[in-house]
Structure formats: structure tokens, C-alpha cells
Amino acid sequence: LPISCIMKIQLLIISLLLAASSLYARSLDKVFQLLPQPQSVEVFPGKGIMHTDLKFVSTAPGTPVPILGALTDVLPRAGRGGKGLYLQLSGQNVPDSPEGYVLVVNDKGVIVTARTEAGLFYGCQTLEQLLEDSRDFGREIPQMKITDYPAIAYRAVHLDTKHHLDRMEYYYRMVDRLARYKVNAVIWELEDKLRFTRRPEIGAPNAISKQEMQALCRYAKERNVEISPLVQGLGHAGFILKHHWELRENPASDWEFCPSDPRTYEVQFDLYLDALEAMPYGKYLHVGGDEITAIGIDDRCKATGKTAFELQMIWLKKVCRFAVEHGRIPIFWDDMPLKYAGIWELVLSDKSEEEVAKVWDTSKLDEAIGLFPKECVYMRWKYEDAATSAHRRLLKWYHDKGLKVMGATAASAGDSPFMPRRNTRSEYVKGFSQLVADNQLEGILATAWDDGSPHLETVWRGFIAQGEFGWNPSARDIGAFKQVHAQREYGFLPEDNRMDFLDELEKAVFFFDGALVTSGHRNPAWGTSDFTLIGLPDKANPGAWSELYEDKIARAKIEADRYEKIAEGIRKAKAEALRNRYTLQVYEQTNNLQNYPVRLILALNDYDTA
């Protein structure tokens, strides 16, 4: 018999066996932890498979083999005896989502069925995790049926390369890691890190060439990851306006373009064209447009007779038209219209519904609705709790006006040196993802602002949280997510508690922030203010320094003990990890760096009291 007939017979047998056992469904052994959590897992009695049992990959006619993981890619594509991995495209008895799939495990093998190659890819990624757990913990994968699909169609993370670039190899590995956790998009804030060919003066010396970026985007596309550019415009334009003084709104500031100078658009459109050519497979062009501080103040703008807000929205219409004409959907940060309307601070607040109801007023937005391009996606960014009353009201306003909205949470908000805090901000990722799913918004983006220069490895738990909660926002709480993250990333079982050190490290870095100052803020990210450093001991007046800084010394002693606890936790984690030791090494050096103020304070105390 030809292979296609054999496969059909095998699929029929497996399906009948599965149906016969469906009356006896049970729960999945806790040693198998899938991330993201599938929508439905049914487990049945009977013999399953071990990670070594699969002997080949077979496809139905017209079904491609997607990019496979390490444990399945080694399997031959020719049918042979034994248990196989069977792949088939079908529109029957599968989820409606193009990324959905059904995965069946039986003693005959594994079947993955999906509508599209993307669904097959994700089904095989889920199988890869099952095989890993079978290998790592010596357990048989039980007979089961997984029916799975995403709650949110567009699940993106943000790359902010304003301040530094990693090696290209790192970005390839990043794509693999994102795909593993079913993140399907990247919005890349390029700044000057693309080698612009139309405006070569803009690119930094270490910028990525368009050809290098095209190759990376092609690699990502094969793994169902779509990369789109973010090219800042109107504001945040220092990387451009340091070269083009003639386009500044304020000659003393490189922050904003003049939106009334036609040459502004000549430069911006050239940069857009280069970015679109470098990233040819994305659907979006993010045009920035946030945090404008002063437009409408020079003679070119005054001559138009337009207000600052009107000038901003005229700019937005022009850049949106460009995006649409070039086959992209424009995205725009939405803070400036909210500031114009006087509701920005309210949207950021956590005021109760009763408090919000008394002051909520969108009349200025209502009057200006004709200025809002309908083709634009308004990126509603809120980096902490997104479920507040004012925020929900704003989302309803967008919906009522027929405007498209995408959510933006933060895996790194840019305000923390060393690393993001609060469980790598995963609770905020979860909360906004749930809101996006409930309101059927255009998608969700986990931003990763680099202002505080955290090592990107310290942001990854937040990225993986976006994979988890963008796919299935409600299945797990944060504690359960952290345990599954530890297993998937490092091979630690939940009862090992091997990542507890990370909770302690997040606490420790708070002391670093203010350890050496008595007033003000010296946080190396945004928010720096005038500050006063602690003084030095006076050898002519021993003990006075220690008395003055008694509280800091007491806290430093606590943090010294915490440092040792963290160091021991990392040492054990490195010894027992099955993978990703590099991330643990980054945490180790982060711990050493954040401990510097502790050691300095204790050394000064020793000197003062010697």
C-alpha cells in the first residue's frame, strides 16, 4: 500500500481507539507541564509512548513538515515500522483559529491535525515539551487529546535597541525561544540600529544591515514569528535630529520634528521605506508619536494657524496614509490625544469607579474624533494594572467610536536598573492579556524598555509570561506560571523550588536603588533627579558616621545575608539545571553587582568603628 493509504488506516485506528476510551478521561500527570497551558487536555487509560518511541515523521498528501524541535527533527521522513508522528492539514474537527491544532497521543504514535502550517508548527512545539518531560523525568506520555488555540491572535514582544545591540546569533536564538512559547510577533524599535541606505547618516556604526535583517525575518517567518518595525517619529527623534537641525521644532532640542516642514516627511518616509524593506514580512508599521512636549511653537507651525494637537493629528494622518499605501497597518502610541483631552492622569490612576464617574469627560476627544485616522491601530499602553475603572472606560470609548486598539503591557518598564521587578512584571502581563481577550482587541505587546539597561536575559521571564497569558490568560495564576517557567526553561520540578532565589534577587535590588543616597533619586533609568550622596567617615570623629547611618547599616546587614542566600540558590540551580545555564550566570553576576552598595556601606562601617 502507498504511504498515504497506510497513514489513513493508522489514523482511523487511532481515532477509533481514542473514541472508545473517551469515557474514562483522567487528569494529566503533574510531571508534564506545558507552556503555554493548552485550552483542553483529555487524558485516557492505556499505554502511551516514551520519548524514544517515535521512529519517523509521516505527512498526509499536501501537508508540509513544519520546522521541528530538536527531539522530532532527527526523525526520518520515510515511513517505517514502529510508532510515528503523523501530520495532516484538515478543516474538520479542529479549532477555527489558523494557529489551533489537535494533538492525539496513542500507543500507535502521535497525530497532529491543524488547518494551517502554523497550527501544525504549534502542535509540534507542544509535542516537543511532552517529549522533553518524558526524557527529563523518565515518564511515559499518556494517551491523550489536546485541543488548543490562542485566546489572542497577535501576541508580540518588543525589542528596544536604542541603547545597545546583541549579536545577531542572539536574535536567532531569541526567535527560537519565542516560537517555543507561541509568541508570534516582534515589534522592533530600531532607532539608529538599522543601516539605513537612503539616509546613511542615521545608522550607528554597529547597525544591522538590511540584508542581515531580511535573513533574520525570513528565519522568524518560518517559525511563525512576524517582525515589524517601530521607527520613532515626531518625538523621540534625537537619533535623527542630531543630524538634521533644520527639521527641529525647537533649535535647542533634538526631541521633536517640525510637523509643518515638508522635509520632515521626506526624511521619515525614507527611513520607513528602508525599515519595511529590511522587515518584509510584517503586517505593521509602528510610527511612534508619543510623549510630544513642544510643537506648534516655531514660525513654520504658527503660520498654519493650527493648534499643537491638530498638528500632531495632521502628522499622524500623513504617516498613516504612507503606511497603508505601502501595505502596512500603522500603529500609534495613544498618550498624546489623552493628554490633550485632560484624562491622561486619570487613566494612569487606580481610582474607583465611583471616583472616576464624577470626573470622566471625553468631550474633547468626541469633538476631535474626525482627526483620528480610522486605518490606524491605537496602542493603548499601560504598564501596571490595566483593569482599572478609567482604563476600562477608555477602551469602551475606543470601541464605541469604531477605532482599533492594541494593548501594550511591559515585561520591562525601563524604570529599574539590573532587572524588572514584581515577578518580572508577569502579573501585569496576565492582567492586560485577559483584558485584551475579553474585549477582542487587535493584540497584545509586551514592551521591554531598555532605559535601565537590564540584561535581556533578566527580561525573558516576562516575555515567556506573554507567551503563556497571550495564549491562555486565565488558566494559571502567577505562582503556577513561575513553577512551570522553571521547569520549561531549566528542567526544575515545582517541588525543587530552585528558582526561589529570583524572588529574593528582585527584593534585593530595591535596596540598591537608594542605598548610597540620602535624598533624591539616582536610578540610572528615567526618573533621575537631584540627589545627595551619603557622606564619608571622619577619622577624627570615630563612630559618628555609623550613628548617622545606623538604619542603612542595619539594612545592609540584612541584605548581606540575602546576598549569600541568593548566591547559594544560584549555585544549586546552576549545578542542577538541564538547560539555559547562561541565564543563571547572568543572574549570578547581577547578584554580585547589586551587592556593591552593601559591601561598601559595611566596609565604611568597619573603618568608622575600627
Task: Map each language-model feature to its residues.
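Bacterial N-terminal signal peptides
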Residues: 12-20
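Extracytoplasmic/secreted envelope proteins and their assembly/folding machinery
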Residues: 65-68, 117, 121-124, 128, ...
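Substrate-binding groove of N-acetylhexosamine-processing glycoside hydrolases
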Residues: 28, 34-37, 41-44, 59, ...
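Substrate-binding cleft of carbohydrate-active enzyme catalytic domains
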Residues: 151-336, 342-354, 377-379
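Short, Φ-rich (hydrophobic/aromatic) sequence segments
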Residues: 38, 67-74, 124-131, 170-177, ...
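Contiguous, structured surface segment used for ligand recognition
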Residues: 26-154, 247
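Positively charged n-region of N-terminal signal peptides that target proteins for export
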Residues: 1-12
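N-terminal small/glycine-rich loop or linker at the start of catalytic domains
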Residues: 143-162, 406-415
